[in-house]
Amino acid sequence: RNYGGIAYDYYGYNISVIDLRNPLFSDGNNMLHMVNKYMDQYKQNRNDLSLKAKTEKYAKIIAKTIIFSDGESASSYGQNSFFYDSAEGLLTSIILIISEFCDDGERHIVSVFKLVQDLLKPSGIKGKTQFQILLDYLPDNHKAKWFAGAALNTGEQAMMSVLSTVLSRLN
């Protein structure tokens, strides 16, 4: 099932296997490493906005890589492009939230996966999703809200579709 060894031995490729369903069978690689690195540096020096920009840049790269893993862009999905664009923004914002607010041992892609699963649960508040409730705790100028833009301002059903898109891409 894991052809990484064959690709390395015979073709010289260095392959990393990331299996979110079975993390113990994955290679030891934290996809959020660069995001966490620059977030930690930014927390030490809040005046250096270039560190914050690098954090956001790497979060966006990870989200784009996961959502558009087939190499296509959102425009090639036709009527579904809204959901894929929104899913990318939502995933970027969740990565930033995990990196900023979780403890060191919890800042990895599995925590992102788990948070997305938790956000799919009903909120109990009519007209509000779990994601909207989560982002209400953040200041108005927090970048996670900016990245979530389109997904944050949709109805409950559309938001569930966006979350399902993210979850399907993380699987």
Language-model segments: residues:
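P-loop NTPase motor domains
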Residues: 1-171
